Amino acid sequence: NEKWFALTDDDSLPEGILDDYTREIYNPEGELCGSHLIDTNSGNKERGICSIPYVRHSDGETVYFPSNLIENLFLSNGMSAGNNFAEAKVQCLSEIFERAVKRQIIEQEIVLPDVPEDVLNKYPGIVAGINGLEEQGFPVVVKDASLGGQFPVMCVTLMNPKTGGVFASFGAHPSFEVALERSLTELLQGRSFEGLNDVPKPTFNSMAVSEPENFVEHFIDSTGVISWRFFSAKHDYDFVEWDFSGSNEEETASLFGILESLGKEAYIAEFSDLGTACRILVPDYSEVYPVEDLIWDNTNKALNFREDILNLHRLSEDQLADLVERLEQSELDNYIDIITLIGIEFDENTVWGQLTILELKLLIYLALGDLEAAMELVEAFLQYNDNTIVERGLFYQAMHATLEVALSDDLEIEDYIHSFTRMFGQETMDAVVGSINGDVMFYGLTETSMKLEGLDRHLRLIESYKKLHTARAKKAGL
């Protein structure tokens, strides 16, 4: 049910994409171009902008949202399955409120009221879970995050006295008990007690808690920073023992009513191909990334690099020089991994899977014989290396030592090659020396192309996508 909109000659937004309300949000200054909305997966500029139909909640009208806009701003926020559409919508809206209210609390450094002990005692299972955490040495604070009964949101915050770190977990649901239970279970979801040693320390630095990247960290795994003000004894709201519960239909109506009271419009897509599921977008409320990213940090920047990077082994010297120059001029963070940059899934246990922009530029400079530029990046790699492939670290240690000799006027590689080989091994030194003299190109990177040879992980994704399309076509009688 996707619809494609051809690009216009002047690159303005094509008619039929978005509505007036959303255009005001996503294109307030008229700077958003059609080319900004080419989807990253297909990269099909000739076909245009891939868009998905959503139903506007207020009047049932269909509005087309570019898939690029959704992937750039909303990530997975507001998606859920359920036994029926009403139940799925309750879960979608609960998730949206959880994250939006959490963001508001963290960014505005709002002080929440504690949940009274007599209220907590109504839920012995939850109290037992809290006591279990405290017995492990983690003080727990339970707070009402409804902002005076406005929203169905709770918060359970864990402190780690061993590290000084704090982990604030939020949960949302029309039922007070379910929201509280979700807040508690979220604390340890996907992490062990040892994992709680990595949670960040609170701060009085308002800039640190309010920057957009901090919210992204909270969205991904709740490891963003929160303010010390969060723990003030002077709370900004009184405790409310709220209750929005009812039938699925009643809960859905209540949650949509909250959005309406905020002046927000919701857009809904329902899916029944593999069970009952839906997605809800609430523009200017449920985005994870800032709207400016559509212009300044769009994922479709991958289209500027994908083909050249996948064809790396077949590029001429001029093409390599052009590629590395474009990477430098892009001012992209050196530590962005290539998986993220070009939108291709590699096996994470391979060199491709852990390759960053920094290492790619380093290998290109070696291939071009620019040893000084390569040396600078080798030093950066060794200083900030997160690569878990041990052999890769040793390769660059050996490369650093060998480049120091190669770039010196006083040293000769023949005087050191024996010792280097004893230290790093024959295979590694053959790769290092070969990379420096041009006999070895892009050491560790297996050759591939736009046909994705050898990239089984991405090919499996494509195969799954084809199966889904086949099933949907069969269901539609096509």
PLM region spans:
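Helix-biased "structured C-terminal domain" signature
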Residues: N1-L478
